[in-house]
Amino acid sequence: MPSSYKLRKKIWKSVYLLITVGILYIGYILIKSGYINEKNDINVTKKSLKDNKNFDLKYNIILKDSIFEGVNKNLNAYKIKTERAIKESNNKYKLDIINAIYNVNQDQTLIINAKEGFLDEESSILDLKNDVKLFFDEIIFNTNDARIDLVNKNITGHSPAKLLYKNSSITSDSFNTKDENNIIIFKGNVSTIIDLSD
């Protein structure tokens, strides 16, 4: 009995040893073949990078809670605050949720709100879209788009506009300002309601 026990023990040890060696060998082959594939992938990537020297790197720079500041031609300051600005190119930004303060002169301030817009810092043009509101003293001005020349103090709009002053109102199809915002010209289907008590 002791010899059969020793024989079985020897056989089991040999089987365990063969299984362990087999597992290690299979692992070695898998690792080696994976390394070769990675090496081939790296070579293919290097080759394709050498062949394609013009890289098309596209990325967006997104600025959260941004402020853009400047002055107009009379050196009155303006400040544009936005919840998000996406840099389109060198000095051009797509803006979301805009709140701006524009000093027309030392005594008068124009407050500007819009849901979206586009700022070109080179030309100092602010294009506003989607629920544009301008507040000037007691005047409220609503439109769907407006283009503001921040330096020359001109505002134009090609969508319907409505000006409210206390109980009076003016509506039109488009508008523009003249003489540094002191004159507003309403164009197309102009309707005026004037309350003389205002």
Swiss-Prot record:
The keyword Transmembrane applies. It is found in: Membrane. It comes from the Bacteria. One of its GO terms (cellular component) is membrane. InterPro entries: LipoPS_assembly_LptC-rel. Pfam families: LptC (PF06835). It is a single-pass membrane protein. The chain crosses the membrane at residues 11-31. The keyword Membrane applies. This is Uncharacterized protein RC0660. Its main location: membrane. Keywords: Membrane, Transmembrane, Transmembrane helix.
